[in-house]
Amino acid sequence: RMGNPPPRIAETPSGILNAVGLQNPGVDHFIEQDLPWLKEQETVVIANIAGNTPEEYAQMAEKLSESSVDMIEMNISCPNVKHGGVQFGTSCQSVGAITREVRAHCKKPLMVKLSPNVSDIAEIARAAESEGADALSLINTLTGMRIDINTRRPIIRNNTGGLSGPAVFPVAVRMVWQTAGAVKIPVVGMGGISTWRDAVEMMLAGASAIQVGTALFSDPYAPLKIKEGLNRYLDDQGIASVTELAGMVKPW
């Protein structure tokens, strides 16, 4: 996948806007060139896939199922070119259909990455769960836009992009809480996590694990610092395992 033409990243207050276009060398290159090195690091490898047709998703899932990856994460915030470019992740029907298609070709645990650009995240989550998802991850980016006031053109060549970083964190916490209360499968929380306090908050909302992305632009060691802070918090609180945090929020 070639990705989008530049400019494709713009800084925003408390975050970034990007329209990179999921540029990558492809699943075959990943399996042959990148995966062997990743497995040498003695870490769990989760392969993220994205496509423009159900067939593309299924083909990638099938190939990765025969590889040594530990899990497949399916990004459904992509346009379905067979249905007018509408994103796969914006309706229960399309989420259920793409999950069912990939599940039929996937031998690995399957995690579905949900879009926040929906009216009811809980019903979307249930649709993915009902069609065989083993876990859910959320949130993906919120759609946003910036305009150069001198040229009067959008700053990003794609016109719009995905907003990530601390600006979306409260939205992510809310959606993780709603999703965790609607499904029985594990929920992985993401969206603006940059400190260990954010990680604790996300897990209290219902996340069993977290992902860190945008914070790495400013601090490549952010995940290590988050882990260290999280361990200190557990010790201070007398909590034996991080799993005990998941969903422990006390709503009013």
Protein language model features and the residues they cover:
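Glycine-rich, positively charged N-terminal anion/phosphate-binding segment
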Residues: 1-43
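Alpha/beta enzyme core
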Residues: 52-188, 194-212
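Short Gly/Pro-enriched loop/turn and capping motifs at secondary-structure junctions
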Residues: 193-195, 217-218
